[in-house]
A protein has these predicted regions:
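N-terminal glutamine amidotransferase
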Residues: 1-35, 49-53, 146, 382
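Acidic, carboxylate-rich catalytic segments that either coordinate divalent cations
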Residues: 4-7, 348-401
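Short hydrophobic-aromatic micro-motifs
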Residues: 5, 12-15, 23, 160-162, ...
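ATP-dependent adenylate-handling active sites, centered on carboxylate activation for C-N bond formation
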Residues: 29-239, 261-310, 327-328, 375, ...
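Active-site-adjacent bridging/hinge elements
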Residues: 121-129, 252-257, 350-361
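Bilobed periplasmic-binding protein-like "clamshell/Venus-flytrap" ligand-binding domains
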Residues: 239-250, 376
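Short Ser/Thr-interspersed hydrophobic loop/turn segments at strand-loop and sheet-helix junctions
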Residues: 247-261, 282-283, 381
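PAPS-dependent sulfotransferase catalytic core
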Residues: 311-369
Length: 401
């Protein structure tokens, strides 16, 4: 395996690479053929129920696992599975990260309400199994919590369900929408909107991003803008342009391929009802005002309405992070030392892929902004990937302690 400069530039700037293969259909701006009809909860219910029934059509299936964060999407899918297949035994799984916001109590309440067995994975050192996870995905991503979910799930069942796609398809990234709308106006050009969009994803890059790379990787922001521009150079509404960019970004080229590779490794069948062709087609034809309430900054409106129908709305947190580790605290506990261990004698620096001076400038600092911590985690993942597949000096069983 060799280094693809464009891939590394994209992953370390956008946290995804559009050259990757994805199981999801790519969307173009003209796929958003907006109709004028009000949203139909019955249609959404039918599509989800049909998908679940077809995926678990084998009568021998007695048990299924589900990743339950306690948020809207995973809770709703749990309710649908419980109602569609009431005889099925369900094991829900949540992840609790050390020194991070603990949302597992919410997930436990939802699991108890729907009478399913709930399991919590506690991760003291989130990065410990990074070599093993990267050996499976074969991509230099550090945010691989799905490895732990799938590893646990395969002890219960060969089916793993999730609420993946709800945010991208039904408009759940409300904090980004509000910021994007504040940065743009009706006269904004496609380039101005592309730049504003990236400002809404600031945690993926650093202020001196151009200094991160070595001599073998050409970086300019124009190369990044060129990949984003097509999503904003069309006649769609501003919010639909953002939804188009979100769908064709991390969902297509990070979350979906990563989760599928990990599930395949553990011989798990993925069940993702919110990413069925029917749901994607229906949601993209739904006017954005029916997905996102700009005045009250509320997204995923149809899914919230379904939660209320299933009497789950009172159990869901108003602000939900999902499976999210506090990287600032992770830096203090494990990540800084691990980065020093692996990046102080870095193979990717020696071979000209990453700028060693940039690493030296920041690695000893204890007051790093979260953007720089995240960048170091990305560099650590790249270093691990490089030692696994290029220099081949690291074993996948290596633990980062």
């Amino acid at each position: 395996m060799s280094v693809e400069p464009n891939q590394i530039r994209n992953i370390l700037t956008l946290r995804y690479d559009p050259s990757q293969n994805s199981l999801l259909p790519a969307l173009q701006w003209n796929d958003f053929s907006i109709n004028t009809h009000d949203p139909s909860l019955e249609h959404i219910e039918k599509y989800i129920e049909n998908y679940i029934s077809k995926k678990v059509e084998n009568s021998d299936v007695k048990r299924i696992s589900l990743a339950l964060s306690g948020g809207v999407d995973s809770s709703l899918i749990l309710a649908f599975i419980r109602n569609t297949l009431p005889e099925l035994k369900i094991d829900t799984i949540s992840v609790k990260f050390a020194d991070s916001i603990d949302e597992t109590k919410t997930a436990e309440k939802i699991a108890e309400h729907l009478e399913v067995d709930h399991h919590v994975i506690f991760l003291e050192n989130y990065l410990r199994d990074l070599p093993k996870a990267i050996s499976i995905t074969k991509l230099p991503f550090w945010d691989l919590h799905w490895y732990y979910v799938a590893k646990k799930a395969q002890t219960f069942s060969k089916y793993l369900a999730a609420g993946d796609g709800g945010d991208e398809v039904f408009g759940g990234y409300t904090f980004r929408y509000a910021k994007f709308l504040s940065l743009t106006n009706p006269k904004s050009t496609a380039l101005e909107k592309a730049k504003a969009y990236l400002k809404c994803h600031e945690r993926d890059s650093v202020t001196d991003q151009e200094e991160v790379f070595g001599e073998h990787i050409t970086f300019s922001w124009n190369l990044i803008y060129e990949q984003i521009l097509p999503y904003f150079d069309n006649s769609l509404s501003v919010l639909d342009q953002v939804l188009l960019a979100d769908y064709n970004g991390k969902l297509m080229y990070n979350f979906s391929p990563i989760n599928n590779k990990i599930n395949n490794y553990f011989e798990l069948t993925s069940i993702t009802p919110l990413l069925s062709n029917d749901i994607i087609s229906y949601a993209t034809n739904l006017q954005s005002k029916y997905k996102y309430d700009e005045i009250n900054n509320i997204g995923k409106i149809p899914l919230h309405q379904l939660l209320k129908k299933y009497n789950l709305d009172s159990l869901i947190l108003n602000t939900k992070q999902g499976f999210s580790v506090n990287t600032l605290n992770l830096w203090k506990s494990y990540a800084q030392k691990l980065c020093k261990d692996y990046l102080s004698d870095s193979r990717v620096v020696k071979d000209g892929w990453i700028n060693g001076d940039w690493i030296k400038k920041y690695i000893d600092r204890n007051d790093l902004d979260v953007r720089y911590v995240n960048k170091f985690l990305g560099l650590l993942a790249f270093e691990v990937w490089y030692r696994l597949f290029v220099s081949k000096e690291m074993k996948s069983e290596t633990n980062l302690n």
